[in-house]
Amino acid sequence: MRFTTEDGVSLEGELRRPESNPRGSAVICHAHPRHGGSKDHPILWAIRNELAQRGFAVLAFNFRGTMRSGGTHGGGRSETKDVSAAVGRARLEADGPTVVVGWSFGANVALREALEDDRVAALALIGLPLEHTLDIPDVPSPAELRLFRPPVLLLAGEQDEYAPEPLVRELASAFRNPEVAIVAGTDHYLWRREREAAAIVGSFAEGSLGR
């Protein structure tokens, strides 16, 4: 499937619907396209499946300039428009709350869009880069994060070199409604822990349905 951003970029997406009527919608944002990121990474497949099983209509998409999406890579800045368009498209599938999930680069973009988008009911940030971040925009300031009211999940691997646990917990303290999950025995890519991480995201997302 395809959908279009407010600045006219056509994006490639894939929609996964639950077996019954959807209870909510979810958007999944992938890692840095300059480092091989796309909607088809194993951790994102696991999350997509988990959310669909829990009743969400799930839209995974490729950022501009990635795979079959149009446009050119915007360094994480114009990509917020991609997330906004994906949220709008996903919400056509369900009347319930919309959860946005981002991994790595996608977590950075998802966070910055969510701060400006009151359609986002919950936000899951997986491996949000807090170290080695020269090629993506800065994480918003604690004062900006404090203004975000919806629940936020910060998930990282125990050995994540981009999202070390102390920095993740420090960042979490800036949010009003944070939850932290550290997955043991894995790194930024969550190898061999995909299902465990997906279950954590799924449980968090499902909690938004009752809010």
Task: Map each language-model feature to its residues.
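Conserved loop-alpha-helix segment in the C-terminal half of the alpha/beta-hydrolase fold
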Residues: 158-178
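Primarily recognizes the serine-hydrolase "nucleophile elbow" in alpha/beta-hydrolase
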Residues: 83-147
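Catalytic histidine-centered segment of alpha/beta-hydrolase-like enzymes
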Residues: 71, 186-198
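Short beta-strand/loop motif that positions the catalytic acidic residue
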Residues: 147-149, 154-156, 160
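Catalytic histidine neighborhood in serine/cysteine hydrolases
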Residues: 173-189
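Acidic catalytic loop of the alpha/beta-hydrolase fold
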Residues: 132, 158-163, 188-189
